[in-house]
Amino acid sequence: MTSVVVVGSGFTGFECARQLARKMRRHAKSGASVDITIISPVDYMLYTPLLPDVAGGVVDARFVAIPLANTLRGVQAVRGRVDSVDFDGHTVTFTDPEERVRSVSWDRLVLTPGSVTRLFDVPGLAKHARGLKSTAEALYLRDHVLEQLELADVDDDPGRTAARRTIVVVGASYSGTELAVQLRALADSAAKQMNFDPADVNFVLLDLAEQVMPEVGEKLGAAAMRVLKSRGIDVRLGVTLKEVHAEHVVLTDDSLIRTHTVAWVTGVTGAPLIEKLGLPTEKGRLKVQTDLQVPGHPDVFAAGDAAAVPDVTQPGNITPPTAQHATRQGKVLGRNVAASLGYGKTKQYKHRNMGLVVDLGPRYAVANPLNIQLSGFPAKAVTRAYHLYAIPRFVNRRAVTLAYLTDMFFDRSVVSFGLSSKEDAQFAGSEGIPMPKPD
């Protein structure tokens, strides 16, 4: 039996496995027999665009996790971290949750390990900051912010109280901006229910760029800036972190901010596995052809955040690592892997940017679907409708819909469950990023 192994269960790997399984079912009567296996450290596909909503207490973490077991019909899901690939022997070696090393053979290999948070050589960053690429990180940020607000309420040291009530978010792209406004809304609910002035909670949003969310253009970026300022978020552009300590940060302009909470949301880079493969890369991502095949390896395909997919609409460029591209590349992957097995024709990946949607908290958003610039309530409606359309499972869509309705009419819950510890949410623990060894 022909064996197809998909590495990674993010948007691209999930969609590839789903499309390929559907195609094989359609060809089953003609004798098609393909064994599809997806290997991932987790048993779900994570809908990452809603992680700011998880951190802000709008959506439950379960609602953004799409289970592989009952969603990918005809696909065997295997828990494990892929460590290496033998391209000559056609085997993948991985470590399972009990630290047992196992291997599986393949006739076609699909490399979609995704991405991890891009870190820089900032002293203390890996130890004291947290990212937003996993449920562990989102849950930790939510619980940590609430815990700090609760501790500030009874702290007798004014300086430490102010530090507990100061949240620093680094990265004014759409993810970082969404996180800042959702945490701001969570803090406002906490202030209302815990009887303190919401103005006592300070939010600082940092970015080296000259504009907030340059992806949405100057007009919508300016609209977003007005919303951020109206909600009391201190936006500082052209500056970032120089040092991170347990109770303060130092910025590149040498100013100091006392804080106990630092969120690092500055972009992504290809998964660590990419460096181990010995294949050509571009900007830290695997080089692939327009049909998503790895050059020189006709049985190997790659796409998503881990691949430098040529953008045929902008010759010389590669597609950005967005959920929109990842999902659509997964569909083309499924088609092309099937074609390589003799079922159908190959297709090059070509997709024009359909625009972005950015949720800016209660009653506001900005969006540019099909280059139509929207802000305010119309953008909010488009943003939420898009997410409900894009979530690939009816049960999850229904749950998120109910969460949105609840958020419209009721205050957010300000309960800290402690489900994700500080160690769980470290970049190494939650994303698998190798950390620098201590001197």
Predicted region positions:
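Beta1-alpha1 glycine-rich phosphate/pyrophosphate-binding loop at the start
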Residues: 1-84, 174-216, 263
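Short glycine-rich anion-binding loops that position phosphate/pyrophosphate groups of nucleotides
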Residues: 12, 114-117, 180, 268-270
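A Rossmann-like FAD-binding core segment of flavoenzymes
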Residues: 33-35, 75-92, 104, 184-290, ...
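Active-site substrate-recognition segment that forms the wall
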Residues: 38, 166-168, 173-186, 230, ...
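FAD-site-proximal beta/loop scaffold in flavoenzymes
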Residues: 127-158, 247-250, 256-328
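Rossmann-like NAD(P)H-binding beta-loop-alpha module
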Residues: 143-199
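C-terminal, flexible cofactor-proximal segment of oxidoreductases
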Residues: 325, 332-439
